[in-house]
Amino acid sequence: MTSSEIIEMLKEAEVLLEGHFLLTSGRHSDRYMQCAKIFQNAKYSVPLCAELAEKYKDDNIEVVIGPAIGAIQMAYEVGKQLGVKNIFAERENGKMTLRRGFTIDKGQKVLIVEDVVTTGGSVREVMELVKECGGEIVGIGSIVDRTGGKIDFGVPYKSAFSMDITSYEPDECPICKTGEPLVKPGSRGVK
């Protein structure tokens, strides 16, 4: 898929929102990628996850994991495309954990997926969990990279689409100065 085809798909799915948003990282932005909308229709989710799975098809992935809630369906679909186990991590008492009988065996090759990467906070938490379990992180994958390729996880990071969307520290946000109400659309549950 070309970047322009992906942009058209994101527009059609009404994923890109404009306004004044509080991101899960605590930063503010004038644009928000509501990637959950991708997963309400297989017309969008299947080809985007297939695009990402294709980038890792030769890496002998054994497990695909994503943080709840945003990457549960994504981990499933990428895992399905790769023909491997898929699980998700949940935050419990402020820390990412494996529950529901999910496991990562020592030495298993793991792909971590996330719908949107802005600061990489949730991804880094899942990376720590995978390391604690003894898994080998082969790479990170996202549908949207909001950093425009600027983030470094220390392992290969590939996205279906990359877009540099500006975000601001709250005390430096020009949108706050206009008085436009702040909207918190995310679901990470971190204060």
Stretches found by the model and what they are:
Residues 104-141:
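A contiguous pocket-lining binding segment that forms or flanks enzyme active sites
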Residues 32, 74-111, 121, 175:
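Short, glycine/charge-rich flexible loops or terminal/linker lids adjacent to PRPP-binding catalytic cores
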Residues 3-9, 127-191:
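PRPP-dependent phosphoribosyltransferase catalytic core
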Residues 54, 76, 80, 128, ...:
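Short, well-ordered alpha-helices that flank and scaffold nucleotide-derived cofactor binding pockets
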Residues 64-65, 87, 138, 158:
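Structural detector of well-ordered beta-strand residues that form the stable sheet scaffold
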